[in-house]
Regions:
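Sequence-specific dsDNA recognition surfaces
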Residues: 13-64, 80-87, 199-212, 226-258
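Non-catalytic DNA-recognition/assembly elements of restriction-modification systems
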Residues: 1-25, 36-46, 133, 180-207, ...
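Amphipathic alpha-helical coiled-coil/heptad-repeat segments
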Residues: 1-8, 131-179, 183-186, 336-388
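A short glycine-rich beta-alpha junction/loop motif
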Residues: 7, 83-90, 104, 112-134, ...
Length: 388
């Protein structure tokens, strides 16, 4: 740790700022209930293995929380309700001259996990900059208020995701304004709709290059499965190849066109995005689907993003240990085909939800960046807070 200690602050090891509580009993899945009053938390940041009906091991509340540290994952949690723990989850409480909410914030930035191993010995030796107690409380209050915004924004995102899934299911089975329905291989659908194999809606389906491509600081973007997420292609972080390699080493199957739909077939399966930039290429982890005149790009994207088709693709994925989506299977998948005008109407409805979703996601990203900046300033004393 840097020896640049702000005036009035001091350097302490972690165990000088908190007390590790004795765990009266360690739980596992055989000692907990599926439901109950008190969670038994695991080594993640937000889940539990089950519940206790009576006699929690640790009592806390909103005004007197307890912080926990997970030995293997380094996950830090602030518990505000009574709870129990599994093995290797260590409950901590503040000492007399430290604030528990401040401890939570500095431990969140304490150490990075180095694989699945015990990290508490390293935490015990870690040194932290500690301001006077009133300043701790003020810093913790500022950071906690930002945490609250982040948590509420995540809840908004969850609600919008649920709304989108429900709306997709409604629109892709009942359409808009229909009164006449018929039975089909995919259940009841509007009478004017068809059920076809996916390939009947495409002029082309393939996947990208398999041989290594030279990398360059400038040139054409190489999109892989990790660059496709939440309906967006992450051009900013995609690697690049030289213009010469793009032209000479690749065929058209690796060079998608604007309006093509990308589908991740390896890694995290089933993520989709519509190509909106020329001059990019894809590797073998990404499939390209080129719609014909019978289906719009955005309808194809929305349809394949819906819960039913996502589940179908994942259920049909092959491979023993590592799963893959095979285009020879996907292209035979049965899909609905509404008339083009109704495809556009469905896309319009879903686009409005997508716009809301994008706005909230940007807010989350901006707030997380703000939190990171505040922590760098406030937890180092670079920016001092005024204490009343």
């Amino acid at each position: 740790m840097s020896k640049n200690v702000p005036e009035g602050w001091e350097i302490r090891t972690s165990e000088a700022i908190y007390e590790r509580l004795r765990v009266p009993r360690v739980h596992d899945r055989t000692t907990v209930n599926v439901a109950g009053k008190f969670p038994v938390i695991d080594q993640s940041e937000n889940s539990q293995i089950g519940f206790l009906e009576v006699e929690p091991d640790f009592v806390c509340d909103e005004d007197n929380p307890i912080v926990t540290f997970a030995n293997h994952t380094c996950a830090v949690r602030k518990m505000k309700i009574p709870f129990g723990v599994i093995q290797n989850v260590f409950p901590l409480k503040s000492r007399q001259d430290t604030d528990i909410n401040f401890i939570f914030q500095i431990l969140k930035e304490g150490i990075e996990p180095e694989g699945y191993k015990g990290h508490y010995p390293k935490l015990r030796e870690t040194e932290f900059l500690i301001p006077p107690l009133p300043e701790q409380k003020k810093i913790a209050s500022i950071l906690t208020s930002v945490d609250d915004v982040i948590e509420n924004t995540r809840k908004q995102i969850d609600k919008l995701q649920d709304l989108k899934k429900a709306t997709m299911n409604e629109l892709l089975t009942k359409g808009i304004g229909h009164t006449d329905f018929k039975d089909s291989e995919l259940g009841r659908i509007p009478k004017s709709w068809e059920v076809v194999e996916l390939r009947e809606n495409l002029t082309f389906i393939s996947y990208g290059f398999t041989n290594p491509m030279p990398e360059s600081k400038s040139g054409n973007l190489m999109v892989t499965a990790k660059d496709v997420n939440n309906g967006v292609i992450d051009y900013e972080n995609a690697r690049k190849t030289t213009s010469e390699a793009f032209e000479e080493l690749l065929t058209d199957k690796s060079r998608p066109k604007i309006g093509d739909v990308l589908l991740t077939k390896d890694g995290t399966l089933g993520r989709l995005a519509v190509v909106d930039k020329e001059g990019i290429c894809i590797n073998q982890s990404v499939a390209v689907l080129r719609p014909n005149e019978k289906i719009s790009s955005m309808f194809l994207f929305n349809m394949l993003s819906s819960p039913y088709y996502q589940k179908t693709m994942l259920d049909n994925a092959g491979g023993s240990t590592i799963k893959h989506i095979y285009i020879t299977v996907v292209d035979k998948m049965k899909v609905v085909k509404p008339p083009l005008d109704e495809q556009d109407a469905i896309t319009t409805v879903l686009s409005k939800i997508n716009v809301q979703f994008d706005i909230v996601c940007r807010k989350l990203s901006q707030t997380q960046s703000l939190k990171k900046s505040l922590m760098q300033d406030l937890l180092t004393g670079k920016v001092r807070v005024k204490v009343n």
